[in-house]
Amino acid sequence: MQQLTIAIDAMGGDFGPQVTVPAVVQALSQFPELKVTVVGDRDAISTQLTHLNYTLNPRFSIVHSDSVIGNNTQPSKALRHSRGSSMRMALDLVASKDVDACISAGNTGALMGLSRFTLKLLPGVERPALISPLPTKNNQRTWMLDLGANVSCDAETLFQFAVMGSELAEQSIGRKAKVALLNIGEEEIKGNDQIKRCAEMLNQCQNIEFIGYIEGDKLYQGIADVVVCDGFVGNVCLKTSEGVAHLFLDQLKSQLLTSKFKQILAKWLFGDVISSLKGLNPDQYNGASLIGLRGIVVKSHGSADISAFNNAIKEAVHEIKRQIPNRISDRLEAVLLERHY
């Protein structure tokens, strides 16, 4: 059995060890081959272990850190003053190959900057990208990138995102991924120069199954396996979608919980429907991967609860098993060779 090792930034996110530590304990029971190094304030971590009645063992180790990078800290400042922080120390463990992956719910900009600094980019990669799956019809998924790592992107960067996103998606779906560019229309004349130029490049690439442009209202139809956009558009789109999903689920819950009779009636009449709607909960898709690096980094939502953070750990486990950085590197090399001939 392959041993899997992960470093956790225990102090990142809105709740710190109150969420990260129970999620780790849960993951250790789910994956017998998993070993976790939890980086953060030793006393705060130990307090949570006491609450859980969990005893330290060789599969759960603590590395003490003296500081935390705040959510409002500028990436440039975080880079200069990161030594001794839980995020930096967790990433250093990946860089030194003491662990296979790192997970943090901390400052996104700081995580991206520190990841680039400590792990470096894969050969040929201009910028890393944040990618995460979205729920679609028939319980399928669509992977979307970039979700906020890069506010603006040129055509070459978008093209690289398409290649990297395809490889990650294909390791889950087991077939060639259908790739689309997010645009304001499906017609060839629509979009800015970067999108049009990227579309030309993708049309010429036999290594990618490019299906053209896709509009925002088609994101959840399962038309494309991978949707590519810059980080500004992707982040706004993702946050809007999550807000609508939470609003819908909260409204549904408030209506069904007004009386015991309504609860029983709803479960009897709409049990399957209610069960399927749980798939819209963004927590099930927590864990955006920062791809394009020489190591595995998974970004959890700062507001993630225990279950959501556990899903981020599951994503890291999947990427370790599938050796995602190596596969992305090989795919990029194959595309580069194709473009030269």
Curated annotation (Swiss-Prot):
> A single Pfam family, by name?
FA_synthesis
Q: Which cysteines are joined by disulfide bonds?
A: none
Q: Might you name a Gene Ontology BP term for this protein?
A: fatty acid biosynthetic process
How is this protein annotated for GO cellular component? cytoplasm
Q: Where in the cell is it found?
A: Cytoplasm
Q: Name one GO molecular function term.
A: phosphate:acyl-[acyl carrier protein] acyltransferase activity
Which InterPro entries does the annotation name? FA_synthesis, Phospholipid_synth_PlsX-like
Main enzyme class: transferase
What chemistry does it catalyse, as a reaction equation? a fatty acyl-[ACP] + phosphate = an acyl phosphate + holo-[ACP]
* The keyword Cytoplasm is annotated on this UniProt entry: yes
Task: Note whether Lipid biosynthesis occurs among the keywords.
Answer: yes
Superkingdom, taxonomy of origin: Bacteria
Keywords, in A-Z order: Cytoplasm, Lipid biosynthesis, Lipid metabolism, Phospholipid biosynthesis, Phospholipid metabolism, Transferase
Q: What is its EC number?
A: 2.3.1.274
Record-linked PANTHER family = FATTY ACID/PHOSPHOLIPID SYNTHESIS PROTEIN PLSX (PTHR30100), PHOSPHATE ACYLTRANSFERASE (PTHR30100:SF1)
Q: Which family does it belong to?
A: Belongs to the PlsX family.
Q: What does this protein do?
A: Catalyzes the reversible formation of acyl-phosphate (acyl-PO(4)) from acyl-[acyl-carrier-protein] (acyl-ACP). This enzyme utilizes acyl-ACP as fatty acyl donor, but not acyl-CoA.
Official protein name in the record: Phosphate acyltransferase
Which organism is this entry from?
Answer: Aliivibrio salmonicida (strain LFI1238)
Organism lineage string? Bacteria, Pseudomonadati, Pseudomonadota, Gammaproteobacteria, Vibrionales
